[in-house]
Amino acid sequence: MPASIQAAAYADTEIIFDWHKVEGFKGGSIDGIKVIVRGTDGAAQTMVGIDLLFATSHIPTPSDGNVSIIDVAPTTLGTTGAAVDTPGWFNNLVGYVPVAAGDFNDADLIYLNIANVNLAGEEIPVSGDLYVAAVAKGALDFRTTARVNETGFAAGAQTVITVDTKDITLGFAPGDVVHAVDDAVLGTIKTVDSATQITLTKANVDAIADSDIIYNVSPIQLILSGTV
């Protein structure tokens, strides 16, 4: 989810993320999904629904007896942060999972929300490469005020990054991939050292300017369970 798009709240019907290839799923079908959604500037969201779409790269050809499979990835839904406006993915679709606002827990976890979706009896078949995309059903807001507090530095310059304006521990954690609001890549967080400092796994990828607001580019996590 590009940092530059997260700089504004998502609205109903907007693409949260376009087709993302799922790596390492072992089952023959998906029978459950956990959806973890990070908060707004370190506080749990007022949750809205999220529509999850699943697609395959294997398109059957029943008119010729399925003697061949068309192996092609789904085409884009459109521009992230805007409504779906691009066709071509119709025959790749294999599943639709509406995750309602009421499926998520309340704000007891303070910093995020989580939902469990049981697909028993409505399992999503998996063959070929598996893809997932998401569309917002209301205002999802991943904006943050955490920003770099350094003299601007070149690509590959440092692993320790000082931040200010927001306690970084509230919205960021080890493993988060962090980009600046202009989509410049800092890198992956190794440790959150204090309220004002993070350490990356390796030196920053792109040049970074002082006061760049930073974003976790994967604020939504999906955990899929399946059966063989």
Descriptions of predicted regions:
Residues 1-10, 119-146, 216-228:
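C-terminal interaction-tip segments
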Residues 2-23, 40-48, 61-66, 78, ...:
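Surface-exposed ligand/attachment interfaces on beta-rich extracellular proteins
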Residues 16-55, 172-175:
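Beta-rich globular "head" domains
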Residues 16-27, 118-124, 164-168:
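Extracellular and analogous surface-interaction loops
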Residues 35-41, 56-62, 133-142, 181-182:
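Short, flexible beta-strand-to-coil junctions
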Residues 38-92:
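Surface-exposed turn/loop modules enriched in turn-prone residues
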Residues 73-122:
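Extended, solvent-exposed segments with strong compositional bias
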Residues 143-216:
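Autoprocessing Asn-cyclization modules and mimics
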